[in-house]
Amino acid sequence: MGYPKKGEIYLVNFDPTIGHEVKKKIPAVIISNNIHNQFSPLVTVAPLSSNINKIYPFEVYVLKESAGLNENSKIMIIQLRSIDKKRLINKIGNIEDKEIINKINKMISEHFGLSS
């Protein structure tokens, strides 16, 4: 059996949660690198939301066609989480567009103050 790869989108069970954390079963993109994903029981994900009325500077807009999704969505970088792979329900899409991957990487760097 394979392992989740960076850029793949899974339906993820985020419950139980506390406070403002993302709740329910929603899509999330795998953010952690493939070496980590292959050997660790955890993966790092960024949840997606189809509520795109407002896109904040720390979110990445994704067209449904570019990721195999049912709706246009935004990736919520501020909600990054490392989760057990048991929370992954099933693969529902994939982000292959290098421009989107680069935007995600840039947002993560900015979020953690790693950009120069």
Place the predicted regions along the sequence by residue.
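Short, surface-exposed secondary-structure edge patches
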Residues: 1-3, 19
